[in-house]
């Protein structure tokens, strides 16, 4: 593998992880904000809100994990080699 392809793969891996973390990070923050506001307004619905929040946070976090998988593929199993 030539040096330009290697350097581009490393840059792309960094961008994959970085950009894959921005969207879910913002989404998790706003989802948590909504859950806290909902629990503050209706404390009796705390269990249902918390369960829904945890499930949605797991789905959002999976997007970041997909970015990490793409970065690992670019670094260790480079399809452009």
Curated annotation (Swiss-Prot):
Pfam families noted in UniProt: ATP-synt_C
Residues annotated as site: Reversibly protonated during proton transport: 61
A Gene Ontology term for the protein's cellular component: proton-transporting two-sector ATPase complex, proton-transporting domain
Chain's gene name: atpE
TM region(s), chain numbering: 7-27, 57-77
Keyword GTP-binding annotated: no
Membrane topology: Multi-pass membrane protein
Alphabetical list of HAMAP family matching this protein: ATP_synth_c_bact (MF_01396)
Record's subunit section: F-type ATPases have 2 components, F(1) - the catalytic core - and F(0) - the membrane proton channel. F(1) has five subunits: alpha(3), beta(3), gamma(1), delta(1), epsilon(1). F(0) has four main subunits: a(1), b(1), b'(1) and c(10-14). The alpha and beta chains form an alternating ring which encloses part of the gamma chain. F(1) is attached to F(0) by a central stalk formed by the gamma and epsilon chains, while a peripheral stalk is formed by the delta, b and b' chains.
Record key words, sorted: ATP synthesis, CF(0), Hydrogen ion transport, Ion transport, Lipid-binding, Membrane, Thylakoid, Transmembrane, Transmembrane helix, Transport
An MF annotation (GO) of this entry: lipid binding
Species whose genome carries this gene: Synechococcus sp. (strain CC9311)
Similarity comment: family membership: Belongs to the ATPase C chain family.
Protein name per its UniProtKB record: ATP synthase subunit c
């Amino acid at each position: 593998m030539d040096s330009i392809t290697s350097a581009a793969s490393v840059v792309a891996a960094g961008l994959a992880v970085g950009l894959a973390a921005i969207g879910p990070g913002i989404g998790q923050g706003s989802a948590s904000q909504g859950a806290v506001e909902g629990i503050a307004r209706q404390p009796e619905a705390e269990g249902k809100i918390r369960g829904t929040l945890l499930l949605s946070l797991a789905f959002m976090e999976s997007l970041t994990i997909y970015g990490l998988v793409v970065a690992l593929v670019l670094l260790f199993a480079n399809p452009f080699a």
